[in-house]
């Protein structure tokens, strides 16, 4: 909208999610591609990631304007003053807890824009999605399909919901006539096989990220902790039930299509990798 006819180059560890019909050049993060981009000229360069390598790349790239986080004088810095708020909230928990902006408002502001409800963009393989639509229609027998994303990655395991609660939820949903589809990546494979055995819920296995997105597109409701699945569900405009505990609840923008479920006892381990309680707060959801 702002710049009219644009040419986009995008580098990421997960190129499968970037919409191919809107981004002209999509690069997988590796040494060759980092070097390639570092030696190109751009009108605008944006980095919204505070990881050292990403900040160093923004410092190396030749661009008339730079937004976001950059590497300067041997440490993380901001490309413009607009990124200072997000940098400070990432360092000081007591300031982060007072933040009332959602993540999209924050990243739009970093880029000197106002967030006005713009929707996510994602790469959806419609052919794969149609194949899975037919398969899932056959095995769900007309029931409403609920995608249950049981894991949360390895970074913050404090977000995991207890196994016995997942089993209880699945059995209750099945009793109400829903079709439960267990979902996750390779880190959740063993756990999802356990749930399938305990409940007879359907588990299809693990897939490439592109195919995972295509399968998720054929659910009507998604239940998940805060994870990549949350972003996929929002991009696919699915109804979402989000388990939340360790982050600032104001960060999340669900576009009026979801609810956030939190522990009734609160959470003491803000952005924590371990819980000091005898019983994790996730037992209180």
Where are these regions (language model features)?
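Catalytic machinery of carbohydrate-active enzymes
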Residues: 1-285
């Amino acid at each position: 909208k702002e710049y009219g006819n644009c040419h986009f180059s995008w580098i990421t560890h997960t190129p499968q999610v970037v919409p191919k019909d809107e981004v002209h050049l999509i690069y997988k993060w590796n040494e060759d591609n980092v070097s390639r981009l570092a030696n190109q000229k751009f009108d605008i360069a944006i980095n919204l990631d505070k990881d050292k390598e990403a900040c160093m790349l923004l410092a190396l790239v030749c661009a008339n304007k730079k937004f976001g986080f950059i590497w300067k004088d041997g440490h993380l810095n901001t490309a413009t003053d607009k990124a200072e708020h997000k940098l400070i909230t990432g360092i000081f928990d007591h300031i982060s807890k007072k933040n009332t902006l959602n993540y999209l408002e924050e990243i739009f502001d970093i880029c000197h824009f106002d967030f006005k409800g713009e929707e996510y963009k994602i790469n959806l393989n419609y052919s794969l999605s149609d194949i899975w639509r037919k398969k899932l229609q056959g095995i769900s027998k007309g029931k409403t399909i609920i995608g249950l994303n049981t894991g949360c990655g390895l970074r913050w395991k404090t977000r995991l919901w207890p196994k016995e609660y997942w089993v209880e939820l699945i059995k209750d949903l099945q009793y109400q006539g829903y079709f439960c589809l267990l979902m996750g990546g390779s880190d959740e494979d063993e756990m999802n096989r356990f749930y399938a055995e305990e409940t007879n819920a359907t588990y299809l296995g693990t897939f490439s990220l592109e195919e995972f997105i295509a399968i998720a597109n054929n659910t009507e409701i998604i239940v998940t902790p805060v994870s990549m699945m949350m972003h996929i569900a929002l991009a696919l405009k699915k109804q979402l039930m989000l388990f939340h505990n360790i982050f600032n609840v104001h960060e999340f923008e669900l576009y009026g299509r979801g609810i956030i479920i939190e522990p009734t006892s609160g959470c003491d381990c803000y952005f924590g990798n371990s819980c000091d309680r005898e019983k994790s707060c996730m037992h209180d959801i």
